[in-house]
Amino acid sequence: MCNIAGYIGYERAAPKLFEMMEKQEGLGGGFYTGIATIHQGKLYYRKVIGDVARLLDKTDAATLPGTMGIIHSRTKSGGDVEWGHPFVNEKENMAYIANGAGGFFEKIRNKDAIAQALSDAGHIFRSRTPGATGNYPRFSDGSSAHVSDVMCHLIESFILECGGPAEAMRKAFIEFPSEIVGLMIHTDTPDCIIASRINQPLMIGRDENSTYLATTAMAFPDLNWINPMPTTSTATIYQNSINILPFESIDYSVASIFPWEKSYNRVMTLLSNGSAKTLAELMKETNEFWPKNEVSQSAMMVYEILRHLKRSNKIRFLSSTVEGVDKDIDAPRTQAVLNRLR
């Protein structure tokens, strides 16, 4: 699990993005962090190994211009700084971030073949590394690249084929599915953020001047309108409107009925002895309640359970650090703990 966020509005995006990511990075990321904005037709991006604090300390990310942008915080799943998000194309006019994994689709998609075909067509992957890295796409020469780098270039290839970034992203998610959600910005469409979601969480929040996106609504400021993005769809998100187009011709289904009661009770049982639990630990203990023949929304549900418990003052979050990608760089960790009634 990673964490993502986006903002488009009247105010400068970078401070809004950092504020949202600092609220959620310990829940699912904190090991790599990157940001991208667009201003006056130019893409700006920065990324580091480490958390938001390190990105701000080691780069000029705090000064990036633009009133729209995206930000990502990644898990400890291998690779150097080029394996952090955002991923950009060679022209540096688009940036892509994602949260998720192969999951349900791991055995039915051919990520290696897609990566190799793009490489043969001349695409250059900045994350390409000699030898294998985990379960990431591999090329015929034995090297590997981040799967989101591959997706970034697949989207670019479809932009060249069908023209619009939104339709290209939609087509890429249909052809190369994973248990993911992704955000993209492109200099050809500087007035919108494009999102595609299969099953991983993405909440959308709005006020009178801006639209906010985040893995969890707990990252948002105080907003009156908050809703999840629909599954298996692509959204074009403007400052004052949202257009949603569903996927077509897919041969799988995403579970739409949440096992809320069973999962809520399991979460409360796990927290009842006073122990602190991470999001990943709570997800693992509730996975059994989802149907095996559908793609689950486990992360979305657990995030929403935690948001409900936090708003009703039944839990609090504890912040600590763990060893990061490098031994001298710590990563944030957030755990939920039950509040005891006095």
Residue spans for each PLM region:
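Conserved short alpha-helical segments that host acidic/polar catalytic motifs at enzyme active sites
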Residues: M1-R342
